Curated annotation (Swiss-Prot):
The gene is Nme2. Major role in the synthesis of nucleoside triphosphates other than ATP. The ATP gamma phosphate is transferred to the NDP beta phosphate via a ping-pong mechanism, using a phosphorylated active-site intermediate. Negatively regulates Rho activity by interacting with AKAP13/LBC. Acts as a transcriptional activator of the MYC gene; binds DNA non-specifically. Binds to both single-stranded guanine- and cytosine-rich strands within the nuclease hypersensitive element (NHE) III(1) region of the MYC gene promoter. Does not bind to duplex NHE III(1). This is Nucleoside diphosphate kinase B. Its cofactor is Mg(2+). InterPro entries: NDK-like_dom (IPR034907), NDK-like_dom_sf (IPR036850), Nucleoside_diP_kinase (IPR001564), Nucleoside_diP_kinase_AS (IPR023005). It is found in: Cytoplasm; Cell projection, Lamellipodium; Cell projection, Ruffle; Nucleus. One of its GO terms (cellular component) is cytoplasm. One of its GO terms (biological process) is negative regulation of apoptotic process.
Amino acid sequence: MANLERTFIAIKPDGVQRGLVGEIIKRFEQKGFRLVAMKFLRASEEHLKQHYIDLKDRPFFPGLVKYMNSGPVVAMVWEGLNVVKTGRVMLGETNPADSKPGTIRGDFCIQVGRNIIHGSDSVESAEKEIGLWFKPEELIDYKSCAHDWVYE
């Protein structure tokens, strides 16, 4: 079997406030991915600026940081085969108007500025984001009893 990879998923303040945390976790679990780490926190502006550093020159950057700092987020690390790519498909397009029904954004979002969830866009950015949000000892290594029922 190919190597399992990890991705960073964050439920944004609007997803938390709308009570969608359980539904989002459920979808990742039902897909067969394994939760490796999770924390509930209100990220500082400095932390968010570091997370979104690649967007710092975009006109929407200050509003994005303010929005992400407006309430608590749920930061998670998920593990599985092709979890980065599959996770992005599960999330839907960044703009919910372009997202298909059945995706998280297609089912729960209307506007791009309130798209409820973030997911790493590559294995490299996942590694960077996981390192920014979690200490190594916060990543829990265990074998799920469902592993052999999900993977050949």
